[in-house]
Amino acid sequence: MAKTIQAIRGMNDCLPTQSPLWQKVEGSVKRVISAYGYNEVRMPIVEQTHLFKRAIGEVTDVVEKEMYTFEDRNGDSLTLRPEGTAGCVRAGIENGLLYNQEQRLWYMGPMFRHERPQKGRYRQFHQVGVEVFGLNGPDVDAELIMMTARLWRELGIDQHVRLELNSIGSLEARANYRTALVAFLEQHLDVLDEDCKRRMHTNPMRVLDTKNPDVQAILGDAPKLSEYLDDDSKAHFSGLCELLDAAGIQYQVNERLVRGLDYYNRTVFEWITESLGAQGTVCGGGRYDGLVEQLGGKTTPAVGFAMGLERLVLLMETLELTDVRRSVDVYMVTAGEGTLMAGMKLAESLREQVPGLRVMCHFGGGNFKKQFKRADNAGAAVALILGETEVAEQTVNVKDLRNGEQVTLPQSDVFTKLAELI
């Protein structure tokens, strides 16, 4: 017997029992984003490797350890996208979307990182990204945060997430801060683990988000980034906080929040839950005003966020917010000569007259008991039953599968009855 082929570790199937909750989350995401007038963009999942090296930073964990990179038959180095912002910027530059104009874009799709798989962290994962180009004020930062807050309310998880904010300032301010931070860390080399020592020389601000409790203990005495911020960044952050206060959105300023990608500046933020253990970040974003120019475009202010769908789905499962619409509304049961075709025609008529109604026809024969069992397994609320008599008389038996009540009606009245039952 041939060996069974299995999915790649960290890359999971979404099965029919799981997909309704995914569809609910995706539907809510699309409704909320569309309510703000943003437009969808779709990019390839494979990009040239140097795009991510230039955008994310060559000394980040993503580029150094986590990317799926390979050579194609032409010898070009290609990478499965580990995040969406770089590809969105590339698409905007290449297609002239960012030339002296404002763009508000969103995308949804799979991303890939070679990490150790664990609950809430996978090698193929799905992200929703929202990106705004051409606006540099704190007002659009606030709108993005308000958008995410609206989504949490729609999903029913707003009481289970909290917002953390920070400003990491301009490039010059961060350079001055890095010098002070490295000087501080060099005084505590005996406490730093090997990963922190490596980061101290490549990307010292990443030491701030270490999970090592011994290092966390000394960071309380480390220089504070807020003391090195330029005046423009301070004013921008103050304006953002005022807008969030006016909107009634609660937040906590976390001076150690720096995000893991090099392209961020000024505003950074994360939405965090305590319900998922170590994988608590469900959404993160911030400003990246230099990235468009860094990738070959004109100087263009930009801000955005990304959220992981796996973690949102996992959070809703953890909170038992899994009540979703059934996959089948009506199940067509037929028995006798010529009844199957009559049932298929009636089902097609229902689909045309009631958009969104989900009608499943029984195929494969079998007695009524077998067909009703299939209807229950499909999760249908109502069964429509056609025998030879009903076909001849243009009637149909309508059975409510939730309470067993059954009535016989003219086929022309079945639409009205279904509206009552579903």
From Swiss-Prot:
Enzyme Commission number, as recorded:
6.1.1.21
Record field: catalytic activity = tRNA(His) + L-histidine + ATP = L-histidyl-tRNA(His) + AMP + diphosphate + H(+)
Record keywords, A-Z: Aminoacyl-tRNA synthetase, ATP-binding, Cytoplasm, Ligase, Nucleotide-binding, Protein biosynthesis
**Could you say which enzyme class this protein belongs to?**
ligase
Question: Which compartments is it annotated to reside in?
Answer: Cytoplasm
Concerning InterPro entries, the annotation shows: aa-tRNA-synth_II, aa-tRNA-synth_II/BPL/LPL, Anticodon-bd, Anticodon-bd_dom_sf, His-tRNA-ligase, HisRS-like_core, HisRS/HisZ, HisRS_anticodon
First-listed, main subcellular location of the protein, grouped into a coarse class: cytoplasm
In Gene Ontology terms, what is a biological process of this protein?
histidyl-tRNA aminoacylation
A GO molecular-function annotation: ATP binding
Classification via CDD domains: HisRS-like_core (cd00773), HisRS_anticodon (cd00859)
Q: Which GO terms describe its cellular component?
A: cytoplasm
Quaternary structure?
A: Homodimer.
HAMAP family reported for this sequence? His_tRNA_synth
Q: Which family does it belong to?
A: Belongs to the class-II aminoacyl-tRNA synthetase family.
> What protein am I looking at?
Histidine--tRNA ligase
Native organism is: Aliivibrio fischeri (strain ATCC 700601 / ES114)
